[in-house]
Amino acid sequence: MISIWGQIQNILEKSLNPGLFKVWISPLAAEVQDDVLRLVAPNEFVAAWVRDRLLDDIVQAATTVLGSAPTVVVDAAPQGAGSLSPRMGRAGASASAAVPGANAADGTQPVPAVQISSAVQAVAARSASGVGARAAHVAQPSQLGLPLDMPAPNRALNWRFSFDSFVVGPNNELAFAASRGICRETLSADTLFLSSGPGLGKTHLMQAVGRALCEASNRAAPRVEYLTAEEFATRLIAALKAREVDRFKARYRDVDVLLLEDVHFLQGKERMQDEVLATVKALKSRGSRVVLSSSFAARDLKNLDTQLVSRFCSGFLAHIDKPGFETRRRILCEKARLHQVMLPDNVTDLLADRIRTDVRQIESCLHNLVLKAKLLNRQISMEMAWEVLGHYAQQEVVMDFEGIVRKVCEGFGISPKQLNSRSRKREYVVARNSVFYLARKHTDLSLKEIGDRFSRRHSTVLKGITSIEREMSRETPLGRQVTNTLSLIERNGRITYP
């Protein structure tokens, strides 16, 4: 009988380029416990490559096999480990000291982990240099694979944003100043809490802080850890299962700056909250700085431990509002400059006037406009801008709650009765969460008032909104479906323009 990991590998083997599968998926060992899929790579080089480039493909394949999206953890095998767990591997693989990848059915023998480690690095090096030779003989390695410990966090991160590319306006100037202040240690508080709706610049500022600190020119540059609350929880689960909690604690409590995004994800997860609270306390006691972000103001995080909320509120609180017309216009000009195009003034004004929801939509609209002009080899014009705008929610949509419910039911093909039911059927849950998300975005209803309409608790609404935001941020079939459906509802469901 093919193991769960074997089934997942079969799907990946069909969907991925053969070279990608052979080099990066075959060497992985696997263990499935509850809703966690733990993958072990021969070394950190392979583990990091898989995390950065193939994690979404693995999650998608695992979801197909398991029926629900698991938490996927990719770790490197400890240095000098003679074998991997007997429970790990592909169907037919030996329970001895081997990494899966050899198929017992074809008569080949499993290859020891350290040998695969050497082979993988050799194949990757040849691929990068343009040499297409196939891996034939696995040479005896001259040294063991990299240890589990990652290098200094600063060097392991890839910062996409900087303070220089952040467009400052009345809506975000306080958050911008506070973020720069915590880098320069001119902010009187050692904790900064950033909050805003999705797509308004939290991630940009968080990464700008990390980048500014890591680019310090002296050798005393601070140690920085940057991750989301979901990643923190995933790594904690992996540490608990591997009985390496002390190692986990040492890693996150021994940094100079912790950047933790999307802390609203922690709601309802008591074990995770306890660890975050202990980590924040430890960091503050050693004089470290902590920067947190959330899609909700700290006061709205009512399903968190009161001590944790108190810690969040004890620092400097900075909220980012939606950008005004002039700020949106300057954002368009800055992004056009990065695209190396000259945007006509009338087109700039049109886009700035019509897209008011968030910065991410502004950037996406401009990107599609520039791409369309390049593909058609035409100049950007008002006519082309209007065509591209048809795919976006123009101006801030004004809908009432009943209208949102009606449009969501139409969009997801379900009835209001099914929407209000207690069923945990996937399409009903996604539709309900979509109503929560749109109601918070387009009405003045509080989270409690939204929950009351469905006879649900405040925490259920908060969790639903977080779930939708997480799906929309992922490049998965479900994420794309949710994004497209909600965009269509917003475009067709507007009543008036403000």
Swiss-Prot record:
<comment type="similarity">
    <text>Belongs to the DnaA family.</text>
</comment>
<dbReference type="GO" id="GO:0003688">
    <property type="term" value="F:DNA replication origin binding"/>
</dbReference>
<keyword id="KW-0963">Cytoplasm</keyword>
<dbReference type="GO" id="GO:0005886">
    <property type="term" value="C:plasma membrane"/>
</dbReference>
<dbReference type="InterPro" id="IPR024633">
    <property type="entry name" value="DnaA_N_dom"/>
</dbReference>
<dbReference type="InterPro" id="IPR001957">
    <property type="entry name" value="Chromosome_initiator_DnaA"/>
</dbReference>
<protein>
    <recommendedName>
        <fullName>Chromosomal replication initiator protein DnaA</fullName>
    </recommendedName>
</protein>
<feature type="region of interest" description="Domain III, AAA+ region">
    <location>
        <begin position="156"/>
        <end position="373"/>
    </location>
</feature>
<dbReference type="InterPro" id="IPR010921">
    <property type="entry name" value="Trp_repressor/repl_initiator"/>
</dbReference>
<dbReference type="GO" id="GO:0006270">
    <property type="term" value="P:DNA replication initiation"/>
</dbReference>
<keyword id="KW-0547">Nucleotide-binding</keyword>
<keyword id="KW-0067">ATP-binding</keyword>
<feature type="binding site">
    <location>
        <position position="201"/>
    </location>
    <ligand>
        <name>ATP</name>
    </ligand>
</feature>
<keyword id="KW-0238">DNA-binding</keyword>
<dbReference type="Pfam" id="PF08299">
    <property type="entry name" value="Bac_DnaA_C"/>
</dbReference>
<dbReference type="GO" id="GO:0005737">
    <property type="term" value="C:cytoplasm"/>
</dbReference>
<dbReference type="GO" id="GO:0008289">
    <property type="term" value="F:lipid binding"/>
</dbReference>
<dbReference type="InterPro" id="IPR013317">
    <property type="entry name" value="DnaA_dom"/>
</dbReference>
<feature type="region of interest" description="Domain IV, binds dsDNA">
    <location>
        <begin position="374"/>
        <end position="498"/>
    </location>
</feature>
<dbReference type="InterPro" id="IPR018312">
    <property type="entry name" value="Chromosome_initiator_DnaA_CS"/>
</dbReference>
<feature type="binding site">
    <location>
        <position position="202"/>
    </location>
    <ligand>
        <name>ATP</name>
    </ligand>
</feature>
<feature type="region of interest" description="Domain I, interacts with DnaA modulators">
    <location>
        <begin position="1"/>
        <end position="69"/>
    </location>
</feature>
<keyword id="KW-0235">DNA replication</keyword>
<dbReference type="InterPro" id="IPR003593">
    <property type="entry name" value="AAA+_ATPase"/>
</dbReference>
<keyword id="KW-0446">Lipid-binding</keyword>
<comment type="subunit">
    <text>Oligomerizes as a right-handed, spiral filament on DNA at oriC.</text>
</comment>
<dbReference type="Pfam" id="PF11638">
    <property type="entry name" value="DnaA_N"/>
</dbReference>
<feature type="binding site">
    <location>
        <position position="203"/>
    </location>
    <ligand>
        <name>ATP</name>
    </ligand>
</feature>
<feature type="binding site">
    <location>
        <position position="199"/>
    </location>
    <ligand>
        <name>ATP</name>
    </ligand>
</feature>
<dbReference type="Pfam" id="PF00308">
    <property type="entry name" value="Bac_DnaA"/>
</dbReference>
<dbReference type="InterPro" id="IPR013159">
    <property type="entry name" value="DnaA_C"/>
</dbReference>
<dbReference type="InterPro" id="IPR027417">
    <property type="entry name" value="P-loop_NTPase"/>
</dbReference>
<dbReference type="GO" id="GO:0006275">
    <property type="term" value="P:regulation of DNA replication"/>
</dbReference>
<dbReference type="GO" id="GO:0016887">
    <property type="term" value="F:ATP hydrolysis activity"/>
</dbReference>
<dbReference type="GO" id="GO:0005524">
    <property type="term" value="F:ATP binding"/>
</dbReference>
<dbReference type="InterPro" id="IPR020591">
    <property type="entry name" value="Chromosome_initiator_DnaA-like"/>
</dbReference>
<dbReference type="InterPro" id="IPR038454">
    <property type="entry name" value="DnaA_N_sf"/>
</dbReference>
<comment type="function">
    <text>Plays an essential role in the initiation and regulation of chromosomal replication. ATP-DnaA binds to the origin of replication (oriC) to initiate formation of the DNA replication initiation complex once per cell cycle. Binds the DnaA box (a 9 base pair repeat at the origin) and separates the double-stranded (ds)DNA. Forms a right-handed helical filament on oriC DNA; dsDNA binds to the exterior of the filament while single-stranded (ss)DNA is stabiized in the filament's interior.</text>
</comment>
<feature type="region of interest" description="Domain II">
    <location>
        <begin position="69"/>
        <end position="155"/>
    </location>
</feature>
